Regions:
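GST-like fold's C-terminal all-alpha helical module
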Residues: 71-170
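Long, charge-rich low-complexity segments
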Residues: 180-191
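Phosphate-coordinating loops and pocket residues in cytosolic domains that bind phosphorylated ligands
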Residues: 26, 170, 179
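Short loop/turn and capping residues at structural boundaries
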Residues: 14, 179-180
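GST-like domain detector, emphasizing the conserved glutathione-binding G-site
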Residues: 1-103
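Residue-level recognition of oxygen-bearing side chains
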Residues: 49, 160, 173
Length: 191
């Protein structure tokens, strides 16, 4: 989203993670997305690093104003830890059935969700009355969490958080970056 909003000129390559192109693995052997190769050859392969780099190049919406790095760190650390174990229980617990969820991790994530909901009961956005990169960095993870058990999510005691999430999911910039792209392969030239 930050790349899109910043107006950065880049080539988007859509891949299937189970069939990673050799060129991707050459650029970033860890084999995760994103992989962004700057003009000088430097590779950025962490989402947060890439977003911050893009916004430092151009921040037309002022998303870095009021950015709360500590709140994003809580999201990327403890919340993501519990989200992954809630959503993908069988990856972390050999006794969990495929597709099972881990309610103990949902409960731990709910503590963080409650804190976010409390913020949003006071303000329109996580750090105040203006949207900034804190909101943009966090909402995709809340979207993932909400999609695990949608009926539960709709009944959960987080109305302000649900409204905030709906606003972000329906935003034009999000719809633009979620547009489907054709699959890319090493045999192709730039898209």
């Amino acid at each position: 989203m930050a790349l899109h909003v910043s107006g950065a000129d880049y080539e988007h390559r859509e891949i299937i993670l189970r069939d990673k192109p050799d060129s991707m693995l050459t650029a970033s052997p860890k084999g995760t997305v994103p992989v962004f190769i700057k003009d000088d050859g430097e590779v950025i392969d962490e989402s947060l690093d890439l977003a911050l780099w893009a916004l430092k190049q151009a921040d037309p919406l002022g998303w870095l104003n009021g950015y709360d790095a500590a709140l994003v760190s809580q999201n990327d650390g403890p919340f993501k830890h519990h989200l992954d174990r809630y959503k993908y229980a069988s990856r972390y617990d050999k006794d969990a059935a495929r597709g099972a969820v881990d309610y103990s991790h949902r409960a731990k994530a709910e503590i963080i969700l409650s804190q976010l909901n409390q913020r949003l009961e006071q303000h329109s956005y996580l750090t105040g009355q203006t949207q900034n990169f804190t909101d943009i960095a966090i909402f995709p993870f809340i979207r993932q969490f909400a999609a695990v058990e949608t009926d539960w999510w709709q009944a959960a005691p987080f109305p302000a958080l649900r409204e905030w999430l709906t606003q972000h999911v329906n935003a034009d910039f999000f719809k633009a970056v979620m547009a489907k792209h054709p699959l890319w392969s090493d045999q192709e030239i730039a898209i």
